[in-house]
Amino acid sequence: MPVPPISELNLRTEAFIGGSFVPAADGRTFDAVSPRDGAVLAQVARCGAEDVDRAVKAARRAFERADWALADPAQRGRVLKRLARLMRAKLERLAWVEALDTGHPIANARAVDVINSANCFAWYGEAIDKVYGEIAPTAADALALIDREPLGVVGAVVPWNYPLIITAWKLAPALAAGNAVVLKPAEQSPLSALVLAELATEAGLPEGILNVVPGYGEEAGEPLGRHPDVDKIAFTGSVPIGRRFLSYAGESNGKAVSLELGGKSPQVVLADAADLQAAAESIAWGIFYNAGQTCHAGSRVVVEQAVADELKERTIAAARTFVPADPADDDTIFGALISAEHRDSVDGHLQRARQDGAQFLYDGGAGDDGGAAEPVPGGAYMSPVVIDSSDDPARAIVREEVFGPVLTVQVARDLDHALELANATSYGLAAAVWTRDVSKAGRIARRLRAGTVWVNSFDISSMTTPFGGSRDSGHGRDRSLHALHSYSQLKTTWIAL
């Protein structure tokens, strides 16, 4: 399918503050560059501290106005469900904006990014009027009500790898709970958040309840994190920046902070795995989907020695089907990395691995691409890589998050060794185990240090299940009622009878 002209996408490029699109206070802009071909899609408002302050003040006024915070929860739900319907109605526009801004294959942008984001708003729209308070046990002369109320102003800072989905994960529960939000999208992929602000207004969200301040982290993200009138920061991104937000909170008003900071997720394949072909295909999808730019990507395989050679052979064959191709082609399954700079960062990890003596089992080359087009000149493309690091589990390529299409394999002597290798990381986001013994799988899942453990599968999820981790993967959860509760606080009302 041909790429639609940019003019037909009706891009929004200004900040969204207090219900209106406005330029940055100082008039500055930055280029939104497509990783597909390096083309400049638009000049976007480059917000700074003054713009963030305007947005926070607009959010606070809207929250105190209380037409959203104290509205019937069912009314808030109707607005969120209306937004979900608008997103589905504007599927092509949103999908193309996301594909061109991130390098996601257009088929994935349609079927995953837009649909899952719309479903997230619809889910919280349905859930919000089904959350009940409590009555505490008291003597007969008192009534103690325990209820939840919104926090106030939430600052949401989202990354570039899944900008629409992760924005929905933050916005939907925060808005459902009755908060006002200031959203700072990543400077590498700001466009879908601005379109979403337009659709939210059309859906009936009151002015000031959602504000969007595109810009660079140190110019817009830090002022948001330090602002004394922000009640919570919800951040997804890197470990170093997440730690900064903890510092910003401590140095300002002690605001709540939830962090999702990435991972180095292991897939543990045991000798009794029922279907090595299914495991190999799932492993390939688990790391090479979105060119490996997924926080919980299954970037490490730990396999028992008895089946190691066969699994490596099957996994390499599966990797060959992921050939870099034009994200605008409907047949593409493996698009671009977010930028040439990020591609160079991934390549730096690979160069270091070569210097460290790692064995490269597969490093691109010809494969069956299913008829997808060739990569576009000027784009940020990279082939899949499979590395065996069984001889040195301490290599940086095994321990550090690469955030690219790079899979490492380690061979384990037995189950205990496999668990030792799987847990030899500072992260704790996700893991998988492949075995035909469900009882064994249950025992292993308890020993894997991860917020989510899949058994005989990978990256299967639902809005009903929480997502998040521990240690360097952060704390707090997206999705599910657990996320909804994290955007509210408990209040006790004691009534003397």
Residue ranges and their predicted role:
Residues 240-392, 455:
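ALDH superfamily catalytic-core signature
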Residues 39-42, 268, 323, 372-377, ...:
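Conserved C-terminal structural/oligomerization subdomain of aldehyde/semialdehyde dehydrogenase
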Residues 1-37, 62:
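Hydrophobic face of amphipathic alpha-helices that form TPR/SEL1-like repeat modules
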Residues 39-131:
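Glycine-rich loop-to-alpha-helix module at the N-terminal edge of alpha/beta enzyme cores
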Residues 132-278, 412:
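Rossmann-like NAD(P) dinucleotide-binding subdomain of oxidoreductase/dehydrogenase enzymes
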Residues 38, 76, 98, 178, ...:
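Residue-level signal for inorganic ion chemistry
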Residues 180-182, 360, 452:
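A short hydrophobic/small-residue beta-strand
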Residues 41-47, 64-68, 156, 267-271, ...:
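Short, well-ordered beta-strand elements within core beta-sheets of diverse protein domains
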